[in-house]
């Protein structure tokens, strides 16, 4: 497959309560883009920030000839929905995503462009010498292993959002309308040729991570139910094993009752209660997992917008109240 020459690069950055890091982010990202031989644009998506992030973005986008487009969402929809909103506005042949916390340096952008020029659909990244807590590193390894098992695509660091996508990959992703989206996995679904390179990783200088413990748990549920139906098959297997085990246990208890009498059966009542609680617990876990799938089906059937764009500023245009799916 031959690839068209990269004439323009679009950088999409989701923003959520990053007013402290925004001035430095804009300065470093624009400086990195100026090193490119291609044209470029910087698309910043405010994901319903409650601080002054939106005001800073508007001021930056209103400056003449600064290649910045600011997209304001009416509320917080989540990182990946915000990126999809940015994808809808891109004009580049290569689209790069970047987090706003500056843990992945914008200075890596030219290297991603050079790598993509070698003919790759997707350029992924691995965080070298990762500057995160042991908990976050462990959680990331578990999630990456789960994704690799479910997708069959071996990539070392799905959690790093510093990535480059060819335009046809982005257009394919925009055709997908599921409510829950994990962009790196979705992109690899359509990619024919991918690569992963090591990039620098720094400690977070401003604010705290937007992924709390509960959000990481929700992310794992999202990935589990978005990627595969294997858990449903596993439930069938586990249910069958429990049913057979219960039948065999019932036979065993009847035999023991015949041999040792009713006194033995009374003495084993607590064991029966323990087994009963185990089976009830397994049923509730299964019901919860089924509920996750049913809930996602319900959300998809309602077909509500994935996000709602309140305003677009920059690139010689200002639009209000644009609804996007």
From Swiss-Prot:
Subcellular location: Cell inner membrane
Pathway info: Glycolipid biosynthesis; 4-amino-4-deoxy-alpha-L-arabinose undecaprenyl phosphate biosynthesis; 4-amino-4-deoxy-alpha-L-arabinose undecaprenyl phosphate from UDP-4-deoxy-4-formamido-beta-L-arabinose and undecaprenyl phosphate: step 1/2; Bacterial outer membrane biogenesis; lipopolysaccharide biosynthesis
Catalytic activity entry: UDP-4-deoxy-4-formamido-beta-L-arabinose + di-trans,octa-cis-undecaprenyl phosphate = 4-deoxy-4-formamido-alpha-L-arabinopyranosyl di-trans,octa-cis-undecaprenyl phosphate + UDP
Keyword vocabulary terms for this entry: Antibiotic resistance, Cell inner membrane, Cell membrane, Glycosyltransferase, Lipid A biosynthesis, Lipid biosynthesis, Lipid metabolism, Lipopolysaccharide biosynthesis, Membrane, Transferase, Transmembrane, Transmembrane helix
Segments crossing the lipid bilayer: 235-255, 269-291
Induction record: Activated by low magnesium concentrations, via the two-component regulatory system PhoP/PhoQ.
GO molecular function, one term: undecaprenyl-phosphate 4-deoxy-4-formamido-L-arabinose transferase activity
Protein EC: 2.4.2.53
Major subcellular location class: membrane
Alphabetical list of InterPro entries matching this protein: ArnC_tfrase, Glyco_trans_2-like, Glycosyltransferase_2, Nucleotide-diphossugar_trans
One Pfam family of this chain: Glycos_transf_2
GO-annotated biological processes: 4-amino-4-deoxy-alpha-L-arabinopyranosyl undecaprenyl phosphate biosynthetic process; lipid A biosynthetic process; lipopolysaccharide biosynthetic process; response to antibiotic
Membrane topology: Multi-pass membrane protein
GO cellular component annotations of the record: plasma membrane
Classification via HAMAP family: ArnC_transfer
PANTHER family documented for this protein: UNDECAPRENYL-PHOSPHATE 4-DEOXY-4-FORMAMIDO-L-ARABINOSE TRANSFERASE (PTHR48090:SF3), UNDECAPRENYL-PHOSPHATE 4-DEOXY-4-FORMAMIDO-L-ARABINOSE TRANSFERASE-RELATED (PTHR48090)
Family: Belongs to the glycosyltransferase 2 family.
Biological function: Catalyzes the transfer of 4-deoxy-4-formamido-L-arabinose from UDP to undecaprenyl phosphate. The modified arabinose is attached to lipid A and is required for resistance to polymyxin and cationic antimicrobial peptides. Essential for virulence in insects.
Protein name, UniProt field: Undecaprenyl-phosphate 4-deoxy-4-formamido-L-arabinose transferase
Organism ancestry: Bacteria, Pseudomonadati, Pseudomonadota, Gammaproteobacteria, Enterobacterales
């Amino acid at each position: 497959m031959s690839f068209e020459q990269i004439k323009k690069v679009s950088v999409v950055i989701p923003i959520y309560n990053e007013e402290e890091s925004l001035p430095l982010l804009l300065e470093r990202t624009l400086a990195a883009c100026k090193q490119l031989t291609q044209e470029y644009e910087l698309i910043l998506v405010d994901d319903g920030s409650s601080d002054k992030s939106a005001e800073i973005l508007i001021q930056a986008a209103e400056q003449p000839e600064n290649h910045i487009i600011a997209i304001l969402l009416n509320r917080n929809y989540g990182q990946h929905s915000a990126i999809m909103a940015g994808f809808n506005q891109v004009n580049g042949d290569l689209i790069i995503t970047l987090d706003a916390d500056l843990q992945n340096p914008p200075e890596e952008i030219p290297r991603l462009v050079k790598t993509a020029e070698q003919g790759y659909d997707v350029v992924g990244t691995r965080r070298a010498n990762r500057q995160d807590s042991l908990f976050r590193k462990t959680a990331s390894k578990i999630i990456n292993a789960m994704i690799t098992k479910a997708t069959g695509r071996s990539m070392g660091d799905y959690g790093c959002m510093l990535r480059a996508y060819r335009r046809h990959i982005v257009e394919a992703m925009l055709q997908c309308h599921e409510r829950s989206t994990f962009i790196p996995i979705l992109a690899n679904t359509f990619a024919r040729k991918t690569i992963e390179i090591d990039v620098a990783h720094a400690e977070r200088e401003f604010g705290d991570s937007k992924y709390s413990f509960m959000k990481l748990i929700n992310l794992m549920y999202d990935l589990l139910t978005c990627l595969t139906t294997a858990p449903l098959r596993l439930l069938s297997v586990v249910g069958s094993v429990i049913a057979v085990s219960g039948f065999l246990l019932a036979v065993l208890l009847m035999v023991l009752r015949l041999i040792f009498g009713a006194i033995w059966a009374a003495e084993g009542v607590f064991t029966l209660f323990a087994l009963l609680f185990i089976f009830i617990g397994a049923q509730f876990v299964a019901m919860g997992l089924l509920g996750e799938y049913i809930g996602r089906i319900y959300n998809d059937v309602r077909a509500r917008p994935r996000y709602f764009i309140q305003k677009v500023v920059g690139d010689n245009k200002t639009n209000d109240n644009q609804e996007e799916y």
